[in-house]
Amino acid sequence: MARVTVEDCIEKVENRFELVLLASHRARLLAAGAPLTVERDRDKNPVVALREIGDETITAEDLKEQLIHSMQKYVEVDEPEAETVPLLSSSPAAAAVAPQSSSDDKDVQFDRMSEEDLLRGLENLAPPTETDDEGE
């Protein structure tokens, strides 16, 4: 039974290896609960999948797209590119908007706090008070 089915399918999908990939993918879909497009006739899922491909009740191109989609781990989404903002000129207005130079950044120092100081500070924090606005 399956041999005749494979010979019917070779006319639809010329590459035997691709046929095996598509039929096995369709058989897995059938096992997962996909609806049948042909009568089962007590056949197993791989034979039903081959019969569906041979009878062209499901197209090989659709199966190929589904197979590719199922194997993708990352689906690339086309997003519009961010617009580039032109650089500001060296006008007085631009100087007022421009950030300070990096030499000023070198003078900034951060306070160091030990873990004990941090824990004491967290213990001294009061819990937030509940307000009547929460129900609104």
From Swiss-Prot:
Class of this enzyme: transferase
Write the record's keywords in alphabetical order, separated by commas. Answer: DNA-directed RNA polymerase, Nucleotidyltransferase, Transcription, Transferase
Pfam families under this entry?
Answer: RNA_pol_Rpb6
Tell me the InterPro entries matching this sequence: DNA-dir_RNA_pol_omega, Pol_omega/Rpo6/RPB6, RPB6/omega-like_sf
Task: Tell me which EC number(s) this protein carries.
Answer: 2.7.7.6
Q: Which reaction does it catalyse?
A: RNA(n) + a ribonucleoside 5'-triphosphate = RNA(n+1) + diphosphate
Residues annotated as region Disordered? 90-136
Could you provide one GO biological process annotation from this protein's UniProt record?
Answer: DNA-templated transcription
**Compositionally biased tracts (Low complexity):** 90-102
Question: What's a single GO CC term here?
Answer: DNA-directed RNA polymerase complex
GO molecular-function annotation terms? Answer: DNA binding; DNA-directed RNA polymerase activity
Whether Nucleotidyltransferase counts among this entry's keywords is: yes
Compositional bias segments (type: Basic and acidic residues): 103-120
Key word Transferase present: yes
Q: Which NCBIfam families is this protein grouped with? A: rpoZ
Q: Its family?
A: Belongs to the RNA polymerase subunit omega family.
* Assembly mode: The RNAP catalytic core consists of 2 alpha, 1 beta, 1 beta' and 1 omega subunit. When a sigma factor is associated with the core the holoenzyme is formed, which can initiate transcription.
Function description: Promotes RNA polymerase assembly. Latches the N- and C-terminal regions of the beta' subunit thereby facilitating its interaction with the beta and alpha subunits.
Q: Kindly provide the name given to this protein in its UniProt entry.
A: DNA-directed RNA polymerase subunit omega
Report the source organism. Methylorubrum populi (strain ATCC BAA-705 / NCIMB 13946 / BJ001) (Methylobacterium populi)
